C-alpha cells in the first residue's frame, strides 16, 4: 500500500523566483495490488507526488508510507534499500545508449550486487515477460519506441518491486503502441500483483487501465474514487473537462442540428442518461416505457468499458409535455440514473 498522510510540499523561493506550493493537504491511500491513476494538468503536482513516493523529495509536512515504511523519514542506506521496492517507468525511456537491452535491464541488479549467473537468469525472465526475448542484444538505437519502453518496464521490475510508478510512460507513443503497453502493464499487475501508480494527463490511459483514480488540480486532490464512479458522476469542473476529452459530450450531428430550446406540439424532449453495467441501457429504456406507460425513443447511445465496468450514455426522446418530463426525470432520479434535459426535437 502507498499512503499519503497530511502531505504538503513547498519549494522555497530561488534566484528571485517565488516559492511554490506544489502539494497541499494530500490524504489518500493506494490499495496494495491495485492500478491507480493520478491525473492532472501540467503544474497540478503530479511530478512532486512521484518524487515523494520514491523518496527523491521530502514532504514539507506529513508522511508517505510505502509497504508500511515511512519513506519520508528514511535516508542513506535505509532509503536506498527501500527504493529497490519501487520501480520507475519514464516517459522518454532513459536507457543507456551504450548498453544492449539485456545490459540495460541488468544495471539495477549489478548495482544491487547480484551474482552474474543470477543476473543473467533474471534478465532472460524479464525479457520474456515483456515480450522482447529476441531483442536481448539490440541497442536502444535499434529498437522502436514501444520496444524501448518494454526494456524500461523490464528494468523497472528487475529488483522485484512491490510498487511500479509509471510517469507519463505512454505519452511519447502512438495510439496502437500505447494500447499494447497498457495491456502489458495490466498483465504484469495480474501476474505479479505489483501495485501500479499511473501518473498521466490523459484520461484515455486511466479509462483503459486503472481501477481507481485520483484527480489533482493546483496541488489539491479535487476528486477520487473508482474509475466508473468518476466517469458517471464527475463533480469537479477539472474532472468534467478531462471526461469531455475522452468520452465527449457531443451528439451525432444529425441529432444535434435538430435540437431546439423550446418544445413544439407533438415533439419530444431530449434527455441524456448515464448508465452502468452490462445491459443497463436496454433495461432503462424498457423499464421506463413499461412503468410509466410512455413511448421512449433511443436517439443515440455510447457504451464504454471503464474500470472493468460497462459505462454508457443514452440519449432518449420522450413526449415533450412538462408533466411527462417531470415524471421521467423523477423516475430516473429514484433509480439513481444521472440525467439532464438537452432540449427538444420536433
From Swiss-Prot:
Part of the ABC transporter complex MetNIQ involved in methionine import. Responsible for energy coupling to the transport system. It comes from Bradyrhizobium diazoefficiens (strain JCM 10833 / BCRC 13528 / IAM 13628 / NBRC 14792 / USDA 110). It is an enzyme of class 7 (translocase). Keywords: Amino-acid transport, ATP-binding, Cell inner membrane, Cell membrane, Membrane, Nucleotide-binding, Translocase, Transport. It comes from the Bacteria. Its main location: membrane. InterPro entries: AAA+_ATPase, ABC_transporter-like_ATP-bd, ABC_transporter-like_CS, ACT-like_dom_sf, MetN_ABC, MetN_ABC_transporter-like, NIL_domain, P-loop_NTPase. This is Methionine import ATP-binding protein MetN. The gene is metN. GO terms for cellular component: plasma membrane. The complex is composed of two ATP-binding proteins (MetN), two transmembrane proteins (MetI) and a solute-binding protein (MetQ). Residues 2-243 form the ABC transporter domain. It is a peripheral membrane protein. The keyword Metal-binding does not apply. ATP binds at residues 40-47. Its EC number is 7.4.2.11. Pfam families: ABC_tran, NIL.
Amino acid at each position: 500500500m502507498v499512503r499519503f498522510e497530511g502531505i504538503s510540499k513547498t519549494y522555497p523561493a530561488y534566484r528571485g523566483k517565488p516559492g511554490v506550493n506544489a502539494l497541499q493537504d494530500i490524504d489518500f491511500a493506494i490499495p496494495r495490488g491495485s492500478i491507480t491513476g493520478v491525473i492532472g494538468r501540467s503544474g497540478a503536482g503530479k511530478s512532486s507526488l512521484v518524487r515523494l513516493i520514491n523518496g527523491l523529495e521530502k514532504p514539507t509536512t506529513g508522511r508517505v508510507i510505502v509497504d508500511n515504511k515511512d519513506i519520508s523519514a528514511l535516508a542513506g542506506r535505509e532509503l536506498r534499500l527501500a527504493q529497490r521496492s519501487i520501480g520507475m517507468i519514464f516517459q522518454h525511456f532513459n536507457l543507456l545508449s551504450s548498453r544492449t537491452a539485456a545490459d540495460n535491464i541488468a544495471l539495477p541488479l549489478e548495482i544491487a550486487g547480484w551474482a552474474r549467473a543470477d543476473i543473467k537468469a533474471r534478465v532472460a525472465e524479464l525479457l520474456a515477460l515483456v515480450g522482447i526475448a529476441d531483442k536481448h542484444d539490440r541497442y536502444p538505437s535499434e529498437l522502436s519506441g514501444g520496444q524501448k519502453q518494454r526494456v524500461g518496464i523490464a528494468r523497472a521490475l528487475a529488483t522485484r518491486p512491490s510498487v511500479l510508478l509509471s510517469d507519463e510512460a505512454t505519452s511519447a507513443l502512438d495510439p496502437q503502441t500505447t494500447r499494447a503497453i497498457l495491456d502489458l502493464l495490466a498483465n504484469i499487475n495480474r501476474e505479479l500483483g505489483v501495485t501500479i501508480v499511473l501518473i498521466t494527463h490523459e484520461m484515455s490511459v486511466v479509462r483503459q487501465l486503472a481501477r481507481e483514480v485520483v484527480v489533482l488540480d493546483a496541488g489539491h486532490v479535487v476528486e477520487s474514487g473508482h474509475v466508473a464512479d468518476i466517469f458517471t458522476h464527475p463533480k469537479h469542473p477539472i474532472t468534467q473537462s478531462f471526461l469531455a476529452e475522452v468520452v465527449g459530450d457531443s451528439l451525432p450531428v444529425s441529432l444535434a442540428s435538430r435540437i431546439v430550446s423550446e418544445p413544439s406540439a407533438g415533439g419530444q424532449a431530449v434527455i441524456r442518461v448515464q448508465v452502468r453495467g452490462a445491459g443497463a441501457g436496454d433495461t432503462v429504456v424498457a423499464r421506463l416505457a413499461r412503468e410509466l406507460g410512455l413511448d421512449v425513443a433511443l436517439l443515440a447511445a455510447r457504451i464504454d468499458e471503464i474500470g472493468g465496468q460497462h459505462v454508457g450514455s443514452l440519449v432518449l426522446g420522450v413526449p415533450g409535455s412538462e408533466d411527462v418530463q417531470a415524471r421521467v426525470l423523477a423516475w430516473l432520479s429514484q433509480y439513481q440514473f444521472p440525467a439532464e434535459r438537452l432540449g427538444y426535437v420536433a
